[in-house]
Amino acid sequence: MKTIFFFICISLYTTYIYAQTNYYVVTKTFNENGYIYQCDVAASKTVTLYNKSNKLLFTTQSYKNTGETFSQTDEGIVLLQYDVWTRAERLSIVNAAFSASEKQRVKGHELIITMCINSDTGKVDEVEFSFMNFGTYATIPISVYRKIETDLKEKVWYIPTEEGKKLNYIYYWWAQEPQ
């Protein structure tokens, strides 16, 4: 009886340890099934996680016709038309990507999601995630982030304003706690 109890305890403990795996301790590249993700860990322990094919996130946001760097003002230059559907869809995509146990694990903490939006089409071209490497999001497997990226690219689009159409891309970010 003691042996059975011991093995049950060990199996539960092993499951607990597995669930707490930190995937993003150091800078590294993840070669997955058909995609490559890069995990950059700064000295501040901030993780930047993105598809290795991303290019825009490393390009200065600028005006197409002049090449002049774009700077957002304190008043806020409107680059995208606001609509309730797009907001609800992107929030829903993030919520759906996390399992119930993952949502419980990250409860009370927000994930920062950054997108580069095509200024001509309004489609999402690139997605990036930011979180602390000692926080709860560091225990979420790469497949969850990949699901968010592909769904945002596939299911979300915006309508750029006339000012937004002048840029090489539109930078957009938000913080969200999965519900």
Where in the sequence are the language-model features?
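Charge-biased low-complexity segments
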Residues: 20-179
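Bacterial Sec-dependent N-terminal signal peptides
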Residues: 1-27
